[in-house]
Every structure is written in structure tokens, then in C-alpha cells.
Amino acid sequence: MPTINQLIRKGRLGLTHKKKVPALGKSNPQRRGVCTKVYTTTPRKPNSALRKVARVKISGYGEVTAYIPGEGHNLQEHSVVLIRGGRVKDLPGVRYHIIRGALDLRGVQNRKKARSKYGVKKSG
């Protein structure tokens, strides 16, 4: 136990909070990366599906797992993608989303509603 004098000199260390999206750093809302693996995985109980995810290599950080939203995609190994924060609740370890319609990932085909979230231009 420290003495009063030691506390006056040094003080106590405050708690450091763990970042929810460490790969984005302090000031980046998005970051670019290269896909190293594109695959499907199954969600936690009680859900059942084949969720599309990709391992993305970010320069200056390492590899993260990112979710590919929407129906259908054209991603493959070495595709360049833009990732944003945002976890997928039923996929453990997936804390990032890939942005549709940016860089190598096309927008969702035949999407009419919520187009801005899936990178689809207005038609007609």
C-alpha cells in the first residue's frame, strides 16, 4: 500500500478502456485493405445461416475479419476493399463491415430500398 507522500508524487493510474475498433485507430472512420481470404461462416446459436466474411490485411495494423453485407458479392483474394467499424452480433470476432460500392466491391444488384447502404446508384 502506498504512503500519502508516494500518492502525492505519482498518483494512481486511471483505467484504460479497450477500443471497439482498434484497426481504425483514433482518427480514421474507414481504412483500405486487401482481402486475403473470402469465405462463409456460421453464426452463433440460436441463428443459422452461411454468413459471408473476408479476412482483410490492413497496412500498419495486421489482419481483421470483416463482414460482407447484402446479397451476392464479387470479392476474391487480392480485392482492395474499404472497411468501417460495426460488429456483427452473431459472428464472434467480426468487428468490421466492408463498404459496398467502394473500390473493388460492387454494389448490390437490383436493390431498390436502402440503396445508400449498399452502394447502388439511382436508376431512371
UniProtKB/Swiss-Prot annotation:
Matches recorded under SUPFAM superfamilies: Nucleic acid-binding proteins
Keyword Cell cycle listed: no
One CC-aspect GO term: small ribosomal subunit
Coiled coil feature spans: none
Keywords, ordered alphabetically: Methylation, Ribonucleoprotein, Ribosomal protein, RNA-binding, rRNA-binding, tRNA-binding
Any one GO biological process: translation
One of the Pfam families matching this protein, by short name: Ribosom_S12_S23
Function: With S4 and S5 plays an important role in translational accuracy.
Name of the protein in its database record: Small ribosomal subunit protein uS12
Organism ancestry: Bacteria, Pseudomonadati, Pseudomonadota, Alphaproteobacteria, Rickettsiales
